[in-house]
Amino acid sequence: MPQVALTFDDGPDPRWTPAILAALRAAGATATFFVLGECVRRHPGLVGEAIADGHAVEVHADHHTSHADMTRADAAADLDRVLDVLDGLGVRPARWRTPWGIEADWTRGIAAEHGLEVVGWTADTKDWRGDPAADMLAAVLPDLRDGAIVLAHDGLGPGALRDGCEETVALVAPLVAAARDRGLEPGALR
């Protein structure tokens, strides 16, 4: 069946990740969570909860810093830290989404050294702006097709213009329904 990947960045967050997980559970859908090591260290149980629900857990960063603002050595050390914390939980990521999707000349080389695929997105909810769920859905509908990767957030990363993820939680059910109406199965990255 054709698929659309649902992805969430910047967690786990003790308030918003459980709400996103509950919304996905209610909709009967899975997703991929690109996590921050600094958040995983504070809330490791949320990673286990996501995995228990059938979601994928992948790498975002240890600290949310753009590769444009880092040296290769700093980015490699940041990646090593988040991989170490995930390894301690028994999680072996296969994918890496860099903060803001920004890559440096050396990003893919570091990824290859760790056996990671660098993954971006094709449909951006821009939920960091705090728009209503209906507006976010309207924005991603034109890009909802087989193989699409939808970007949303279960945490409040740097640059967020909102103070919560209520609208992202509210987006899950209509987004899943819209995908299914188009003959797409929403789920984790394959």
Regions found by a protein language model. Name each.
Residues 8-10, 35-38, 59-61, 97-100, ...:
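A cross-domain feature marking catalytic cores of carbohydrate-active enzymes
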Residues 74-79, 132-138, 165-170:
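Charged helix-capping and loop-helix junction motifs
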Residues 26-27, 41, 162-190:
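C-terminal domain-boundary segment and adjacent tail
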Residues 65-70, 158-162:
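A short acidic, helix-capping loop that chelates divalent metal ions and anchors anionic groups
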